[in-house]
Amino acid sequence: MNLDLNQLVKWHREFHRFPEIGWSEFWTTSRIADYLEDLDCFEIFLGKQIINPDFVRGRKQAVVDKGLANAKAYGANEKWLEKMEGYTGCVALFDSGKPGKTIALRFDIDCVNVTETRSPEHIPNKEGFASINDGFMHACGHDSHITIGLGVALWIAQNKDKLTGKVKIVFQPAEEGVRGAAAIAQSGIIDDADYFASSHISFCANTGTVIANPRNFLSTTKIDIRYKGKPAHAGAAPHLGRNALLAAAHTVTQLHGIARHGKGMTRINVGVLKAGEGRNVIPSSAELQLEVRGENKAINEYMTEQVMQIAKGISISFNVAYETEIVGEAVDMNNDVELIKLIEEISLEQPQINNVNSDYAFNASEDATILGRRVQEHGGKAIYFILGADRTAGHHEAEFDFDENQLLTGVNIYTSLVQKLLS
């Protein structure tokens, strides 16, 4: 197998065709494991070997069951499905057998809930690799991340005798909704890493640009609040009911009234409110889906605590039961200077790169930061960077596609990083 653009495009289009949402990436994980096994130099870890179930966020059993059934129907390797034990994602360990550093590289693998455009001008339609899973699409470029990760693995297999130390390639499930990284971090699988690197393709940068030091990663918590009241006839006996919808409505106004923190940026958004059973019934159930963000972990924790206090207070005020669930999370992270300089240096060595930006305000959240911070807290160094690529539409849009030539650029940046740290 040759490590060239043709091979990378082939992989990318294969994974683009079969997108799977978070915690249901059974076919994707199985296929990744197939390719890794063929390289014959990696130990492959799956399931509870890399996932701590106590820290799994936003995993719905119905989605898991459907994903597993679809993977089996599409021919996923039963050997890997059994080893997953219901949890997706994998880690590939290369051990050179020689003393040296350990590097962890993270690539996310899930898709988004978007129906891919049927426009004949859309390249995946022209070339026959559009999504076959209706309602799901790799509209954020994670199929490219999988491809780059496999490209790095192939390069390692071809250069294994020249390397020292260890490389751990993390194929992470459920990045969308920032749901997957915490469970991997809490498994301890990367606690021994001296270096951690991850990236995103395109996003805010076009072909020819690398953002070596995006800053202002926001800590975030995704929270669901559910209220349970009591139904009653809205005309004849409203006094017998306990109104969950009214409780939820008051919650929304109070949440948006949380005092902003004086030491940094805060954000809150209630994105979904669902309630009620009928126009003549006192609503007995309500659910809110919301997120808070903070400039750092402490500020985000302040926002989260305020949300929990409001939910509790409203439940008492309206005499309704309540429950809260954290369904996603990410933290802030500062890139380490040593790795920023390395990514700058490596990027400028690539003929396709003509611009390296080392000061970009990200002002969003990414759960790779949980893994990066985990490595930093254990004495290692971490970086998250942006690999520019021209795109046909914004991320999470039905028309999204990107410049496939940048797949090879991505592989070259990562392999150069490995080479400089482990040769």
Curated annotation (Swiss-Prot):
Xref: Pfam families: M20_dimer, Peptidase_M20
Entry function: Catalyzes the cleavage of p-aminobenzoyl-glutamate (PABA-GLU) to form p-aminobenzoate (PABA) and glutamate.
Extra remark: Unlike E.coli, AbgB is not present in H.influenza and therefore the multicomponent hydrolase AbgAB does not exist in this form.
Keyword terms, alphabetized: Hydrolase
Source organism (scientific name): Haemophilus influenzae (strain ATCC 51907 / DSM 11121 / KW20 / Rd)
Recorded name of the encoding gene: abgA
NCBIfam families: amidohydrolases
Names of the cofactor(s): Mn(2+)
Family stated for the protein in its record: Belongs to the peptidase M20 family.
GO biological process, one term: folic acid catabolic process
EC number(s) given by UniProt: 3.5.1.-
Gene Ontology cellular component terms for the protein in this record: cytoplasm
SUPFAM superfamilies: Bacterial exopeptidase dimerisation domain (SSF55031), Zn-dependent exopeptidases (SSF53187)
Gene3D superfamilies documented for this protein: Zn peptidases
Domain of life: Bacteria
An MF annotation (GO) of this entry: dipeptidase activity
InterPro entries: AbgA, Amidohydrolase, Bact_exopeptidase_dim_dom, Peptidase_M20, Peptidase_M20/M20A_hydrolases, Peptidase_M20_dimer
Protein's recorded name: p-aminobenzoyl-glutamate hydrolase subunit A homolog
